[in-house]
């Protein structure tokens, strides 16, 4: 594994326990550092794919583990926020359920040689998920901004709505196999 995109994917996975640890320290500096690490990890999601495609560094490892790293990052942070910060369960559960279902559908579609390209709306969904989770990690406790948690939850609801809409394209691609 001698390429930068794969290292970025691995780094995204390895930073998850650090983000969780900083979150549970539960002071302003730890929250800020945790949110910063989450933002940096989220940015690597863009760069690993971009670099892999631009410099012809696409690998089987990257194809398999990039989406796993994304799901782990979003899933672990979402569960962490649910457990500790009283974040609304409904958008979190919608996001988590969609991610698991779409992962399974993508695997199935790959087996039957059907490709579903990632839409711009799906990219917006991912950005909004990451943005909302960043805000919620920082929260009012880390920022001193009283209503930051509410802003984060509103963005999370928007992301959950887009999650349902974008997940439909995968079900639509599978309908001939049901």
Curated annotation (Swiss-Prot):
Its EC number is 2.7.8.5. It is an enzyme of class 2 (transferase). GO terms for cellular component: plasma membrane. This protein catalyzes the committed step to the synthesis of the acidic phospholipids. The keyword Cell membrane applies. It is found in: Cell membrane. GO terms for biological process: phosphatidylglycerol biosynthetic process. It comes from Rickettsia typhi (strain ATCC VR-144 / Wilmington). PANTHER family: CDP-DIACYLGLYCEROL--GLYCEROL-3-PHOSPHATE 3-PHOSPHATIDYLTRANSFERASE 1, CHLOROPLASTIC, CDP-DIACYLGLYCEROL--GLYCEROL-3-PHOSPHATE 3-PHOSPHATIDYLTRANSFERASE-RELATED. This is CDP-diacylglycerol--glycerol-3-phosphate 3-phosphatidyltransferase. GO terms for molecular function: CDP-diacylglycerol-glycerol-3-phosphate 3-phosphatidyltransferase activity. Pfam families: CDP-OH_P_transf (PF01066). PROSITE patterns: CDP_ALCOHOL_P_TRANSF. It comes from the Bacteria. The keyword Coiled coil does not apply. Keywords: Cell membrane, Lipid biosynthesis, Lipid metabolism, Membrane, Phospholipid biosynthesis, Phospholipid metabolism, Transferase, Transmembrane, Transmembrane helix. Pathway: Phospholipid metabolism; phosphatidylglycerol biosynthesis; phosphatidylglycerol from CDP-diacylglycerol: step 1/2. It is a multi-pass membrane protein. The chain crosses the membrane at residues 5-25, 32-52, 61-81, 145-165. Belongs to the CDP-alcohol phosphatidyltransferase class-I family. Its main location: membrane. It catalyses: a CDP-1,2-diacyl-sn-glycerol + sn-glycerol 3-phosphate = a 1,2-diacyl-sn-glycero-3-phospho-(1'-sn-glycero-3'-phosphate) + CMP + H(+).
């Amino acid at each position: 594994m001698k390429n930068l995109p794969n290292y970025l994917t691995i780094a995204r996975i390895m930073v998850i326990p650090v983000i969780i640890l900083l979150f549970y320290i539960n002071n302003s500096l730890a929250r800020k550092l945790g949110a910063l690490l989450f933002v940096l990890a989220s940015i690597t999601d863009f760069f690993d794919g971009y670099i892999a495609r631009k410099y012809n560094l696409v690998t089987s490892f990257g194809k398999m583990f990039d989406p796993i790293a994304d799901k782990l990052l979003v899933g672990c942070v979402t569960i962490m926020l649910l457990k500790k910060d009283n974040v609304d369960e409904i958008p979190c559960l919608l996001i988590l359920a969609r991610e698991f279902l779409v992962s399974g559908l993508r695997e199935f579609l790959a087996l039957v040689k059907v490709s579903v390209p990632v839409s711009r709306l799906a990219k917006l969904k991912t950005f909004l998920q990451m943005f909302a989770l960043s805000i919620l990690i920082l929260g009012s406790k880390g920022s001193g901004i009283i209503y930051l948690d509410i802003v984060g939850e509103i963005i999370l609801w928007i992301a959950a709505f887009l999650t349902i809409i974008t997940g439909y394209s995968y079900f639509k691609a599978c309908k001939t196999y049901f």
